């Protein structure tokens, strides 16, 4: 008998090769004005999918599908994928690419002008997965976190420095950290080098996951009061809470001192040193003593 001859199996084209083929086929190019950087790393793609933790019954909203690299894998795992794309040049390409997927829906719209209710058409649980353009990161996060119909979780690609702010701990927290923690629990999944994209951005990125539970530590706290106090506290970061809140709220120092004492917070501390539990105490104290 002759020696066994190993079977030669053609490997799938790399994500970079797929991206170039699609861009050439539809005469596409990354649009700098839209902050487009297309994902070409299989390893990074796998990390996003693992973090998303999708089930066949899940509905997913994908913001900015780009060339559809992530979209294709989402479609294999979720019950429905609704992609929102603003770039009119990508619409035909995405429509053609996914015409064989009955669980795919494409919305040609600016995500910042489209609410979750408009996207979904009904009140259903959903997850958000997105490779966000840097220039709309904060706006998109705020839009979905503040929406009446919030996602169960968000897995987003953001600028590395923004990711560090999102997951910062007490002592380093800024207004962005605090805002996200009011609604959910953020965690860093992975740092992503520029080479994972085409064209590569000038800075590194990171994958962040935000889980939005039914109830949070801030349950019972007025959203309006919380953000009013938080913006005042961080408005002049180098100042003590006593001075920052007095200036930001336009309230006399004796009244602010009384609020801080009532919440058990040293007036000489700064906003970034407060834990979420302490912000809750301060908010409840403020609500119980209208100034």
Swiss-Prot record:
UniProt keyword annotations, A-Z: Cytoplasm, Methyltransferase, RNA-binding, rRNA processing, S-adenosyl-L-methionine, Transferase
Pfam families for the chain: RrnaAD (PF00398)
Chief location bin: cytoplasm
Entry keyword S-adenosyl-L-methionine: yes
The UniProt record lists the keyword S-adenosyl-L-methionine: yes
Residues at which S-adenosyl-L-methionine binds: 37, 39, 64, 85, 110, 131
Compartments it resides in: Cytoplasm
Reaction catalysed by this enzyme: adenosine(1518)/adenosine(1519) in 16S rRNA + 4 S-adenosyl-L-methionine = N(6)-dimethyladenosine(1518)/N(6)-dimethyladenosine(1519) in 16S rRNA + 4 S-adenosyl-L-homocysteine + 4 H(+)
Any GO molecular function: RNA binding
SMART domains in alphabetical order: rADc
Family of the protein in this entry: Belongs to the class I-like SAM-binding methyltransferase superfamily. rRNA adenine N(6)-methyltransferase family. RsmA subfamily.
Role summary: Specifically dimethylates two adjacent adenosines (A1518 and A1519) in the loop of a conserved hairpin near the 3'-end of 16S rRNA in the 30S particle. May play a critical role in biogenesis of 30S subunits.
Protein's recorded name: Ribosomal RNA small subunit methyltransferase A
Species the sequence originates in: Dehalococcoides mccartyi (strain ATCC BAA-2100 / JCM 16839 / KCTC 5957 / BAV1)
Lineage, highest ranks first: Bacteria, Bacillati, Chloroflexota, Dehalococcoidia, Dehalococcoidales
Gene field: rsmA
């Amino acid at each position: 008998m002759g020696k066994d001859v190993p079977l030669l199996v053609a490997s799938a084209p790399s994500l970079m090769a797929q991206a170039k083929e699609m861009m050439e086929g539809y005469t596409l190019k990354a649009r700098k004005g839209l902050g487009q950087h297309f994902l070409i790393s299989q390893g990074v793609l796998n990390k996003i999918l693992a973090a998303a933790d999708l089930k066949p019954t899940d509905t997913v909203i994908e913001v900015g599908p780009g060339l559809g690299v992530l979209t294709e894998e989402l479609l294999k795992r979720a019950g429905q994928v609704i992609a929102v794309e603003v770039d009119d040049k990508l619409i035909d390409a995405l429509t053609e690419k996914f015409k064989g997927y009955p669980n795919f829906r494409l919305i040609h719209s600016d995500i910042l002008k489209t609410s979750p209710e408009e996207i979904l058409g009904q009140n259903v649980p959903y997850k958000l997965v997105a490779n966000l353009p840097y220039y709309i990161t904060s706006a998109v996060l705020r839009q979905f976190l503040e929406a009446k119909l919030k996602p169960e979780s968000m897995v987003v690609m953001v600028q590395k420095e923004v990711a560090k702010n999102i997951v910062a701990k007490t002592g380093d927290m800024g207004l962005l950290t605090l805002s996200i923690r009011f609604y959910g629990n953020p965690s860093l999944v992975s740092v992503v080098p520029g080479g994972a994209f085409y064209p590569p951005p000038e800075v590194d990125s990171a994958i962040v996951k935000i889980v939005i539970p039914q109830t949070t530590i801030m349950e019972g706290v007025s959203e309006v009061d919380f953000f009013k106090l938080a913006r005042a506290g961080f408005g002049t970061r180098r100042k003590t809470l006593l001075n920052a809140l007095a200036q930001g709220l336009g309230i006399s120092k004796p009244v602010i001192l009384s609020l801080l004492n009532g919440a058990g917070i040293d007036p000489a501390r700064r906003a970034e040193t407060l834990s979420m539990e302490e912000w809750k105490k301060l908010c409840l104290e403020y609500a119980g003593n209208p100034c």
